[in-house]
Amino acid sequence: MKRIGVLTSGGDSPGMNAAIRAVVRKAIYHGLEVYGIYHGYAGLIAGQIKKLEIGDVGDIIHRGGTMLYTARCPEFKTLEGQLKGIEQLKKHGIEGLVVIGGDGSYQGAKKLTEHGYPCVGVPGTIDNDIPGTDFTIGFDTALNTVIDAIDKIRDTATSHERTYVIEVMGRHAGDIALWAGLAGGAESILIPEADYDMDEIVSRLKRGHERGKKHSIIIVAEGVGSGVDFGKRIEEATGLETRVTVLGHVQRGGSPTAFDRVLASRLGARAVELLIEGKGGRCVGIQNNQLVDHDIIEALAQTHTVDQKMYQLSKELSI
């Protein structure tokens, strides 16, 4: 293999640039040419492809977002779109592809794999919901962003003696809510993977209020429902003054943490190694701090599961 490509797809996550940097530098170190594909699969179909040199990835390891930009691409879900993408890869002489992104990005890599095109997936999403890895690129940074917000909101919640509902990202996975809620000392955490008992939450808030606790923090993953609606229900049920903060896309931005920079560098470099070894159709990850790789089709057949013991711990500590 002499020439590979790299793209980022779907929602961006802090650390993607560090992964791109690792792919480019690792490939050049081994004598390969690297081509950046801009705007994800949409850019692949459109032929937005440019050769990358070492200088192109200088001064990006600390930057959030992705220098290759990203986009959603419904067209790539069709056979026609996939064949257009493969045509562009062949036109540019690209023999293997590194795809950095989440579940949708992996689905695209899976399709290319099924067409016989060598791809390696690198998990880049703040949701931490990709099977086959303990952590995804961007999760740690997003987690720290949320914890910082919780700490600051708790200051004002204490001053005004209010209950605050904080809505965080996570349509299908509650890792951000769970980890941030546990680290931030939240009184209640609501995640998509677990049913919640409104009466229990209300009782917990009232018990705390009765023993002199004048403020509370509730973390709600967006997949559970609207934080605004939940805040109204809490205020009506408890009579406690309640405010709602929806953190939104601030969770996707910012300079990646050291953990995400190192993780992205390790995973990006390993993806290149797999292509050099002729092992396409794989996805990389980290488990017990060891690099691993899995068949991408088998990985997509699995379902991410939340840590139920951690969820139970969060409930026990919020009495």
UniProtKB/Swiss-Prot annotation:
**Which cofactors, by name?**
Mg(2+)
Question: What positions does the entry give for substrate binding?
Answer: T125, I126, D127, R162, M169, G170, R171, E222, R243, H249, V250, Q251, R252
Subunit composition and interactions:
Homotetramer.
Biological source species = Anoxybacillus flavithermus (strain DSM 21510 / WK1)
Q: Which gene encodes it?
A: pfkA
Give its localization. Cytoplasm
**Known pathway:** Carbohydrate degradation; glycolysis; D-glyceraldehyde 3-phosphate and glycerone phosphate from D-glucose: step 3/4
Q: Which Pfam families match?
A: PFK
Q: What is its main location?
A: cytoplasm
Q: What does the entry report regarding how activity is regulated?
A: Allosterically activated by ADP and other diphosphonucleosides, and allosterically inhibited by phosphoenolpyruvate.
Q: Tell me, which GO biological process terms does this entry list?
A: canonical glycolysis; fructose 1,6-bisphosphate metabolic process; fructose 6-phosphate metabolic process
Q: Where does ADP bind?
A: R21, A22, V23, V24, R25, R154, G185, A186, E187, R211, K213, K214, H215
- List the catalytic activities from the record: beta-D-fructose 6-phosphate + ATP = beta-D-fructose 1,6-bisphosphate + ADP + H(+)
The identity of this protein, by name, is: ATP-dependent 6-phosphofructokinase
Q: What is its EC number?
A: 2.7.1.11
User: For Mg(2+), which residues are the binding ones?
Assistant: D103
Query: Where along the chain is the active site annotated?
Result: D127
Cellular compartments per GO CC? 6-phosphofructokinase complex
